[in-house]
Swiss-Prot record:
Family per similarity comment: Belongs to the radical SAM superfamily. RlmN family.
Name the record gives this protein: Dual-specificity RNA methyltransferase RlmN
Record has Iron as a keyword: yes
Cofactor(s), names only, from the UniProt record: [4Fe-4S] cluster
SS bonds (residue pairs): C107-C344
GO molecular function annotation: 4 iron, 4 sulfur cluster binding; metal ion binding; rRNA (adenine(2503)-C2-)-methyltransferase activity; rRNA binding; tRNA (adenine(37)-C2)-methyltransferase activity; tRNA binding
Biological process annotations from GO: rRNA base methylation; tRNA methylation
Gene that this polypeptide is encoded by: rlmN
Length: 374
């Protein structure tokens, strides 16, 4: 397939209409028709778009293509979770399907690897190679929807929620993240509710400020420590934007958002005898008193070579109860897919060059910001 062809998965509705007008000489409604075929029916063959005239189909075949990541490996958990390794170029990223009684969530990657070097995250230990294209982000959703299929055919629940919590820091890939989110929300795309699409960030303040007022989705923040000293030890990004800078940016976003209903989800991974003491719980409760939130506790998911351990159930329970004394809403995330290394912090994928982290961060400066070498 010619590399010169235009991948239609790289365009949101506005971009698709512009493409059809400028490159194909076609009206906007034709672009809308093609988007419906791609996202409503999972069609990637122009000949199967039966309400498109033959002349346009031939033009599309000559100039365009519909190419999503392909599944190179699938692992099925005993709890119904599926982890797909999806091939992007000559590398793999990981995408996870998590079915529940009332919904099915897809965890999507935004980068090949991750540059932020959070000490407790398996992905971060693999290095960073590049940002994913729009087609490689939305293509994970497209491919997963095809793999899951219709409920009546496979018995699997269709995807109802998307969380940008896979490999990578989404807000370091703003250029491609925003169009992908637009397609997820668009009625011509996947038509998901803005409350069912969640972006998680480790604290890229400039990226979050760019999102404010631009796109409205649910926000989750990876906090993981109640003070700057500890957070900088386990999350070096805190040396660039400290907790107060981060939370101020969060409050700005929440103030402009309807999707979050005035609250942010705080993610807090519990590391045994590192950040899980009652003193940490008291400190966290005080820290969040001015930021409306719900706190999601995540017991650490071990991976080979990790220096950290999962806390005992008694320590987890004590941490939760301490927070609840302050009338915070506190949940403990149920671990899913840990038998196939698909749980939070376990995604690895296939990263070729572990030396590119700093160079790639500098290259990303033109898209968002420059994070100092961590």
């Amino acid at each position: 397939m010619s590399t010169e062809k235009i991948n239609l998965l790289d365009f949101d509705r506005k971009g698709m209409r512009e493409l059809f007008a400028q490159e194909l000489g076609e009206k906007a409604f034709r672009a809308d028709q093609v988007m419906k075929w791609i996202y409503h029916f999972g069609v990637d063959d122009f000949d199967n778009m039966t309400n498109i005239n033959k002349q346009l189909r031939e033009k599309l075949k000559q100039k365009c293509e519909i190419v999503a990541p392909v599944v190179s490996e699938a692992q099925h958990s005993s709890d119904g979770t599926i982890k797909w390794a999806m091939r992007v170029g000559d590398q793999d990223v990981e995408t996870v399907y998590i079915p529940e009684e009332d919904r099915a969530t897809l965890c999507v990657s935004s980068q090949v690897g991750c540059a932020l070097e959070c000490k407790f995250c398996s992905t971060a230990q693999q290095g960073f190679n590049r940002n994913l294209k729009v087609s490689e982000i939305i293509g994970q959703v497209w491919r997963a929807a095809r793999e899951v299929g219709l409920e009546k055919e496979t018995g699997r629940r269709p995807i109802t929620n998307v969380v940008m919590m896979g490999m990578g820091e989404p807000l370091l890939n703003m250029k491609n993240l925003i169009p992908a989110l637009e397609i997820m929300l668009d009625d011509l795309g996947f038509g998901l509710s803005k409350r069912r699409v969640t972006v998680s960030t480790s604290g890229v303040v400039s990226g979050l400020d760019q999102m404010t007022g631009k796109i409205d989705v649910a926000l989750a923040i990876s906090l993981h420590a109640p003070n700057d000293k500890l957070r900088s030890e386990i999350m070096p990004i805190n040396d660039r934007w400290d907790i107060q800078d981060f939370l101020a940016s969060v409050r700005r976003y929440i103030a402009s958002s309807n999707a979050n209903r005035g609250k942010v989800t705080v993610e807090y991974v519990l590391l045994d005898h590192v950040n899980d003491g009652t003193e940490h719980a008291h400190e966290l409760a005080q820290l969040m008193k001015d930021t409306p939130c719900k706190i999601n506790l995540i017991p650490f998911n071990p991976y080979p070579g990790s220096p950290y351990k999962k806390p005992s159930n008694s320590r987890i329970d004590r941490f939760q109860k301490t927070l609840m004394q302050y009338e915070h809403t506190v949940t403990i995330r149920k671990t899913r897919g840990d038998d196939i290394d698909a749980a939070c912090g376990q995604l690895v994928g296939d990263v070729i060059d572990r030396t590119k982290r700093t160079a790639m961060l500098k290259a990303a400066k033109g898209e968002t910001i420059e994070v100092k070498a961590l």
